[in-house]
Amino acid sequence: MSETPNTNEQNNPNNQQDGTGQNPMPPMPTGKPQMPERPERHNQADGAPKRPGDDDRKSERPTWLSEFSDKEEDFASRLNTRPPQRASIITIIIIFLVAFFIGSQMMNMVHGEETDDLTTSEFVQAVEQGRVENVVYNAGEYTVTGKYYPAATAGSTIAESYNSAIESVDVKLGTILEPSNPSSVGIETTSLEEKTLGTERNYTATYVGQDSLMELLSAHPEVEYQVTLPSNVTEILISVLPMLLFAGLLIYFFSQMSKANNSQMSFGKAKAKKTTEERPDVRFSDVAGEDEAVEELQEIKDFLVNPGKYQKLGAKIPRGCLLVGPPGTGKTLLARAVAGEANVPFFSISGSEFVEMFVGVGASRVRNLFEQAKEAAPSIIFIDEIDAVGRQRGTGLGGGHDEREQTLNQLLVEMDGFEKNDAVVLIAATNRVDVLDPALLRPGRFDRQIVVDGPDVKGRVKILEVHAKNKPIGEDVDLERIAKLTSGMTGADLMNLMNEAALLTARRNKDKIGMDEVNESMERLMAGPERKTRVLNEKTRRTIAYHESGHALVGHMLENADPVHKITIVPRGMALGYTMSIPDEDKFLVSRSAMLDELAVFMGGRVAEEIFCGDITTGASNDLERATKTARKMVVSYGMSEALGQQTFGQPNHEVFLGRDYGNTQDYSPETAQRIDEEVARLMKEAHDTAYEILSARQEQMHTMAKVLLERETVDGEECQALLNNTWDEFLAKKQAEAAAKAADQAEQPQVEAEPVAQVATPAAPVAPAVPEAPQPPAAPQQ
């Protein structure tokens, strides 16, 4: 796995290395040292001059540096062409207010300790005591600010504070002065100035009345005085900004409430996607293997495009068309093809989108969907997985007034109710037609039920051709052979098969998809991925070899069993080994003898363990489970028991909200149940005896098959048929003869070419080692 390159290391010139892995040192200049010039980038497309030597320098740059420069330029171009992002006005206002609040708080934190809030009386007292230096009066805010000297302590006189300050300073200076009159205010000193009452601080106070302030300050001319007039802009902002902010918040909250109301009201609107101009690129020609379904849908499309062609004959367009079939057969693909081919509006929606947690939403969405379709008529509505909303009504588990029933009732009315609706066609798809309501399936609503079943051999060939159209396919790939080997696969399985083959081809670094990749992908889909890391001991490998050989040999000897194509003991998925048996043709009916032979094949692995390993293991658990299920169906469902006669036992329950297949109701007596169990046991015993008889009579062949499997792990094709037909020795002799003939041809080839060129003539010694190696059989590819 490649790692993402570290751009920090690539941008650092000190990390660049040369081919030896060392940091390249530039040659030392002999003259005056100069700073290395940084190469400038010129855009040749803009007409910038191209300096000589640019191509040489560009070619000398390391490859990784060039790739990084290209990526950097591409990122810069995409960054410059990115559309600008618009910020809402409300977001900008909120960010501005938050920044203003944070800034004011930080200013208060910085200057808050140096500013004192004084009362009016404290301010007047400070002015009268001569502790105020200046006064700035704001006429608009009725505040005074400035600088002053605070008093020492509450209740102390100025003289005491002054003398204590002098004494503290003299103590620090090492001299103590004894004042002659401590209570006097004027203390003479030669070392200190007069204003040492404390640290100068800022103050602010509220003072109403400019005239009284003038009278106070006129008595103290030493105080500086200044008056500031209020600004009109400031007053307007102070008075209007709160109202604007409040109005903005109201608008924001109302817009949010409006959005919430709109979202609540939109619950009842349908979420269908309208396809008009940008139609899917799928056409009817892309749908292979379903010719009958395509023909039916083409007729509906033609009726909408050319209604007069049918109306003159008195024909009415089908109101609804129901696509029925197992998963993966192409029901949704057919609907997409209709959307791609039709020249009318196409509405597509899923059945689960009608169901919500609110009561009445489903019915409202059905009404809204058909209203949109009627406005765009003629039009087509496609509902995928309609069983999510169209299940049968009844008591069940949800009651008579279940929300799903209301939605279904509205759908029934819209399709064929009191109002006529001739211009809207409903196409629906489901794989559970058995749980749909009968009123939904009646003529007038879903007039047609188109069965979209699995493709046959011809259909699989066409599907493979469609999926191989845009892929490089090798000459050895035979699509018809692949179609025969993929019996029972749907269109989705075949698409996945070809896609897995393409992925495997890319993993192996090949240019074309070969048959080996297709076979490997087929086994991957059928049995799971190969478990290469699982290590098995020799005893386990031997048990698996005999187990799979038993399955293969019993299946080969029975007439009605499917042909064996491959045997392997390589673990895949949850299996330690498997035998691939694929029918030569599609089977639509299975006979009783074929089912009995299938039971014997299931028991072949367990019987082989009993005969050749001396003990049984858990490896046959899945075989026994499938065999028991088949035997019980023969007795209970298919009436293939001679002892119980031609009848079935057990009826499925009718819990429609559980899918109708939750369980079976036992409608027979305990004695009959005992007879059923005895009959199932008898069928299993007969299958065991059949497999035991076949394997015990062919023990030498079983030993040979197990030995070859232990050596090669996988046998298929001619090797598999040689083992099953007990002609392994003849097969080896044939391969040895072919290898010897090939070696002889290779030995003669150099002698013929050596005659015209004398100097190239060499003895035939180089090909001599091929002669003793020729008898060795070619080894099969290990998996």
UniProtKB/Swiss-Prot annotation:
Basic and acidic residues: compositionally biased ranges: 35-61
Composition skew (Pro residues), residue ranges: 772-783
GO terms under biological process: protein catabolic process; proteolysis
GO cellular component entries: plasma membrane
InterPro entries in alphabetical order: AAA+_ATPase, AAA_lid_3, ATPase_AAA_core, ATPase_AAA_CS, FtsH, P-loop_NTPase, Pept_M41_FtsH_extracell, Peptidase_M41
Pfam families: AAA (PF00004), AAA_lid_3 (PF17862), FtsH_ext (PF06480), Peptidase_M41 (PF01434)
Gene3D superfamilies xrefs: 1.10.8.60, P-loop containing nucleotide triphosphate hydrolases (3.40.50.300), Peptidase M41 (1.20.58.760)
Active site, renumbered: 548
Required cofactor names: Zn(2+)
Enzyme class: hydrolase
Entry keywords, A to Z: ATP-binding, Cell membrane, Hydrolase, Membrane, Metal-binding, Metalloprotease, Nucleotide-binding, Protease, Transmembrane, Transmembrane helix, Zinc
Region called Disordered, residue ranges: 1-79, 738-783
SMART domains documented for this protein: AAA
PROSITE patterns with a match to the protein in the record: AAA (PS00674)
Cofactor notes: Binds 1 zinc ion per subunit.
Domain of life: Bacteria
CDD domains listed in its UniProt record: RecA-like_FtsH
A single GO molecular function term of this UniProt record: zinc ion binding
Positions annotated to bind ATP: 325-332
Cytoplasmic domain ranges by topology: 1-86, 255-783
Topological domains annotated Extracellular: 108-233
NCBIfam families listed in its UniProt record: FtsH_fam
Family the UniProt entry places it in: In the central section; belongs to the AAA ATPase family. In the C-terminal section; belongs to the peptidase M41 family.
Official protein name in the record: ATP-dependent zinc metalloprotease FtsH
Organism, as annotated: Slackia heliotrinireducens (strain ATCC 29202 / DSM 20476 / NCTC 11029 / RHS 1)
Chain's gene name: ftsH
